[in-house]
Amino acid sequence: MHKKRVRNRIIWTIVAVLIVVAGWFSFGPTGSSKQNDKQITVGVVSQTKEDAAIWKSVAEQAKEDYGIDVKIKNFTDYNQPNKALANGDIDINAFQHYAFLKAWNKANHGDLVAVGDTYIAPIRLYSKKYKNIKDIPDGATIAVPNDASNESRALYLLKNAGLIKLKSGNALATIADITANPKHLKIKEVSADQTARVLEDVDASVVNNTYAVPAKLSDKDTLYVEPINKDSQQWINILVATKANKNKKIYQELVKAYQTKKTQELFKKYYGTKQVPAWNTK
């Protein structure tokens, strides 16, 4: 009997210990659930190794400063990330500029909003014939992209370069909006993918990075770089969320983790002047 009582005491002691241990572990998920609440999924498009390195740094900063786990979801085309955001499949996306977002919201009756600026990829006026914009002669031919948004952007670049003046108040400028052309420039409209190729046939051409990079255009070919001002604000790339979630603290913390000196340094390291941080421009 004595041995039986001892054995029973041992069994109950073990049971009691297991109950206490189980109770202790039951509090563990409370901390974990809080950590899960600090997870955010960011949608990007066709991320390059340079982009990945920048986002890795941002994720490390977000984790260190705010305890946020940043997950990156890569999409293959520009039609997917806004739909995924609107459907709740991701929390934020980072692939578009203000002009693209405005057009998407209008076409899709959307209410997505910018929560932070990232960078701008300035377009440039290139020439194979001249080294200085002041050397462009009277009657010179300047090529610009012929699609509405890129042509407008090119015309605003020519305006900021002092080559033409434009009618004020138009978000999208056209050749018809030119009010002054002191050098009597001939504006040649070509497909955006031809702007780099026609450089041998024109005096200068406005080319964006998509086509300047594969054409191996360099700073020595550059006459003028698009400035970051009120005319180019719509081309700044942004972090985007749904209107309902725009004021969430975690999103503002992600923006802060992105907009750092370290991120600026990485842009300079990987992109030089091709992509420029733009969060201090307003």
Region annotations inferred by a language model:
Residues 47, 76-78, 88-102, 191-192, ...:
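Beta->alpha turn/N-cap motifs
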Residues 25, 148-173, 255-282:
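Ligand-binding clefts/hinges and TM-proximal coupling segments of bilobed small-molecule sensing domains
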Residues 72-83, 170-197:
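Short helix-initiation/N-cap motifs at beta->coil->alpha
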